């Protein structure tokens, strides 16, 4: 009788331990996507848009000059790519 009680106790303790380990790993897995998304969409100072003295493509060019490689459209007042018919 004692041997059967000990084996039942060890079996029960093993099942409880297995349940605790599975629950802990499942709770970590639930937090993992949240951590991953927050790290992906975190705003970093290196990726912020920087202020420039020139206007880029399709930006207004009233006060600002267009960046190199672009010209100010006389009709729309936007910086556009130069074309043979634009001078």
Curated annotation (Swiss-Prot):
Secretion signal, residue range per the UniProt entry: 1-24
Pro-piece positions: 25-52
Tissue-level expression: Expressed by the venom gland.
InterPro entries hit by this protein: Huwentoxin-1, Huwentoxin_CS1
GO molecular function list: ion channel inhibitor activity; toxin activity
Family according to the record: Belongs to the neurotoxin 10 (Hwtx-1) family. 51 (Hntx-8) subfamily. Hntx-8 sub-subfamily.
Protein name from the UniProt record: U3-theraphotoxin-Hhn1p
